[in-house]
């Protein structure tokens, strides 16, 4: 038997309705913030991610699904969404649009060759937003407010917003030099990844999952001590907006995101639920990127965005015992007796469905008792029984499956009955 590839999942009907509910709610929330949907290809040129995500990142070095197409071009299944959206922004010359900033959102599958663990898959669904074309602290604050709004709209309460500033390029350069000087004497004690990053991207050492508890990390210089006046002022304005909005946050000077393109504001949303031993799970992350467009041969525009995993959102809802308010039950199940009634039911179903009524019938020639059980399993709100007598008299009993009460109406009036 051929089985599903490792690190992937089948989303079966019982779960797909949850996905559809979440995606529909996210679509609606985006209209409140004036964000428009963008759809980019599932695969892109490998060079896009090598340049846009960063050669020194784990994503590029270890996790990408890359192959040669029949034209001998290097192609990669997208591991994240920002680089592709920025590529589209540049390619379609959106910088010429007077409605700056351009507010975009995306939703779709991403691919990373990761070790399978709870909430992580090699094909995962990512929802994200990008606001491109305005370097303004109020845009950063709006994006952070949106993050909180999204998770709170699903009823999640144990949320912890963690923020930091990674400064502008000048601040980062000075900070990186200080990190190299700090870690160089002890780098031999660190993992091979950290050793390779020392002179390429030393900030990523702070993000190492293997060596996070080493004393050298705890005593490492802090980026906040290397921010120039412009970066400090920008960060203070972002925090002031968050204070005005009443959004609580925690500052973590060691917070650096795993991708190379972040500048200024960086953030993560954590789930901190004491009901499961205080475990903290990263639900969402993002930040500002002020050099990414130029890195991809675009204009000197700036942007900010975030991405979240639908799988992790579902896991968080499960952890907090939150049931989604999903209404997908049938309006009506038709029970038939005899061939003539069954033929009529096919025609009636077509009429009902074209009038916006969710309806179904038996297809296995079950007895009446079996058909009623099927109606109950499907969660039908109402049932009707059609036989020769009902067809002859043009009258049916509509049974409410919740109360057990029935009402006799004319068969021709069934649509009107459900629309009243």
From Swiss-Prot:
Q: Does the keyword Disulfide bond apply?
A: yes
| Cysteine pairs bridged by disulfides in the record | 191-194
> Does the keyword Aminoacyl-tRNA synthetase belong to this entry?
yes
Q: Where in the cell is it found?
A: Cytoplasm
- Mind telling me which InterPro entries this protein's record contains? aa-tRNA-synth_II, aa-tRNA-synth_II/BPL/LPL, Anticodon-bd, Anticodon-bd_dom_sf, His-tRNA-ligase, HisRS-like_core, HisRS/HisZ
| EC number(s) per entry | 6.1.1.21
Q: Which UniProt keywords apply?
A: Aminoacyl-tRNA synthetase, ATP-binding, Cytoplasm, Disulfide bond, Ligase, Nucleotide-binding, Protein biosynthesis
Reactions performed catalytically: tRNA(His) + L-histidine + ATP = L-histidyl-tRNA(His) + AMP + diphosphate + H(+)
Q: Which GO terms describe its biological process?
A: histidyl-tRNA aminoacylation
- From the UniProt record, which GO molecular function terms apply? ATP binding; catalytic activity, acting on a protein; histidine-tRNA ligase activity; transferase activity
**Top EC class for this record:** ligase
Gene Ontology CC annotation, any one: cytoplasm
Q: How does it assemble?
A: Homodimer.
Extract the PANTHER family matched here: HISTIDINE--TRNA LIGASE, MITOCHONDRIAL-RELATED (PTHR43707:SF1), HISTIDYL-TRNA SYNTHETASE (PTHR43707)
Q: Which family does it belong to?
A: Belongs to the class-II aminoacyl-tRNA synthetase family.
**HAMAP family in UniProt:** His_tRNA_synth
Protein name according to UniProt: Histidine--tRNA ligase
